């Protein structure tokens, strides 16, 4: 279908996607075909049992040439990523999301999707938390706990898992902590 000019969207559980590794590599990515992989149940899925955990897709998808991998922070970003993948992109792309109803938090942060670029959620000075997908929920909770202790926390939505936004590595320059015997500088 993709070789014929269509834009197929393949919706699949993460645990079943691994069975198609060879086809993804040879029939889609090496040929640089525009296929969108909508990967449901990505990550740990406790109630689905040990054989249906979506824990391997990151390792094998990021090793495939020409594959882009994204993870939305919430339902709105999932919709924006699908639109980006279908209308503004022309290569293999995977969008991975967890099981269950889409998270509706962080709605106030909706920077336009630019290829390979992370989204700055909150920029402060002490500690930087960089997370992708539903791990932003955890990052937000950690930020609240650390804020109570007086820390200023940056949160970055690393919406592209591959390619990684290397500009975000510059965050380490302003968030470096040099331990000393009695304090941190």
Where does each model-flagged region fall?
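Short, glycine/acidic-enriched loop or turn micro-motifs at the edges of active sites
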Residues: 99, 160, 181
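Conserved thiamine diphosphate
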Residues: 1-128, 137, 153
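Internal active-site segments that recognize and position negatively charged phosphoryl groups
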Residues: 131-132
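Generic long, charged, amphipathic alpha-helical segments
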Residues: 140-173
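Short, proline-centered helix/strand-breaking motifs
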Residues: 34, 163, 177-179
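Single conserved hydrophobic/aromatic residue that forms the stacking wall/gate
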Residues: 174-185
């Amino acid at each position: 279908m993709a070789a014929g000019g269509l834009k197929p969207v393949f919706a699949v559980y993460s645990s079943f996607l691994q069975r198609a590794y060879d086809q993804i590599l040879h029939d889609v990515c090496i040929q640089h075909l525009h296929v969108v992989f909508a990967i449901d149940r990505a990550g740990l899925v406790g109630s689905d049992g040990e054989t249906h955990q979506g824990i391997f897709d990151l390792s094998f998808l990021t090793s495939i040439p020409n594959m882009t991998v994204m993870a939305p922070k919430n339902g709105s970003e999932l919709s924006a990523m699908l639109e980006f993948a279908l209308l503004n992109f022309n290569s293999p792309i995977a969008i991975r999301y967890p099981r269950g109803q889409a998270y509706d938090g962080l709605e106030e942060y909706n920077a336009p999707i630019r290829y390979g670029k992370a989204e700055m959620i909150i920029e402060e000075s002490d500690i930087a938390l960089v997370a992708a997908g539903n791990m932003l929920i955890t990052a937000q909770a950690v930020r609240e706990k650390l804020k109570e202790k007086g820390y200023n926390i940056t949160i970055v939505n690393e919406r592209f898992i591959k390619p990684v936004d290397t500009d975000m590595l510059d965050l380490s320059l302003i968030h470096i902590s040099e331990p000393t015997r009695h304090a941190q500088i």
